[in-house]
Amino acid sequence: VHDHPLVRDVLISGGDPLVLPDDEVMRFVRAFAGLAQIDVVRLCTRAPCVNPARVTRELAAMLGRSGKVWVNTQFNCAGEVTPEAAEACGNLVRAGIPVSCQTVLLAGVNDSAEAMLALFRALQRARVRPYYVFQCDPVAGIAHFRVPLERARQIERACAARIGGLGLPRFVADLPDADRKTPISEL
């Protein structure tokens, strides 16, 4: 990172960083947040959804002290936004950490406008910004979860007609050769 002064945003992922103990998480955060060139240290974690007890007030306060941490989490259906999950997200928000959600569009799970709208509203009530809805990657063994592009576009249009502003995420695909997230409307 030192050799690349144009890098302003660092993503800590590669699995889930919150499976590590607090001191290890903070070692990474401090290493990046301490660099003057870095504006944002993003933590990508499913912990608020799958292990909300992990996101304690103490951990949130430590993360918030850097002033640079943002959290990207992943919820795929409204039922995952439990009171415990909302409390975990609230701990982060109260510590001054912006929280956003990256959802995966999954056949048979959330592939309807109604399911997506319920999720987006549940996230907003938990003070989490719905940010991206990803087209499921073409990974071996999960083809049955992939939603056809035309269906994804229909869901996006139906959602856009019924919710707006911060409640409407971008529907995108993460293409292997692309240098950015590609809106599904362009595919």
Task: Give, region by region, the residue ranges found by the protein language model.
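Conserved AdoMet/S-adenosylmethionine-binding subsite of the radical SAM
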Residues: 1-9, 18-163
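Short glycine-rich or small-residue beta-strand-to-loop segments that form or flank ligand, phosphate
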Residues: 11-13
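Short, internal active-site loops enriched in acidic
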Residues: 17-18, 48, 176-181
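C-terminal accessory regions of radical SAM enzymes
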Residues: 153-187
